[in-house]
Amino acid sequence: MPKLKTKSGAKKRFKVTGTGKVVYAQAGKRHGMIKRTNKQIRNLRGTTTLFEGDAANVKKYFLPNQR
């Protein structure tokens, strides 16, 4: 049986670290930031780790070759 293909949308959104955690960029910084405070915008910077249950599903179904 051939290897499963990685979902191309998922490989743009998620990254698996060396320790196996899944990180992603937070949503909400594309447009409409005039109504947000500077603190809210600042807190959306950088990447965040997915919760373990969600990370397991992402690795199983969307990133099968990244385990």
Swiss-Prot record:
Write out the GO MF terms: structural constituent of ribosome
Annotated GO CC locations = cytosolic large ribosomal subunit
* A Pfam family the protein falls into: Ribosomal_L35p
Recite the UniProt keywords alphabetically: Ribonucleoprotein, Ribosomal protein
Matching InterPro entries, A to Z? Ribosomal_bL35, Ribosomal_bL35-like, Ribosomal_bL35_CS, Ribosomal_bL35_sf
A GO BP term here is:
translation
Q: Which family does it belong to?
A: Belongs to the bacterial ribosomal protein bL35 family.
Question: Mind telling me what this protein is named?
Answer: Large ribosomal subunit protein bL35
Its taxonomic path starts at: Bacteria, Pseudomonadati, Pseudomonadota, Alphaproteobacteria, Hyphomicrobiales
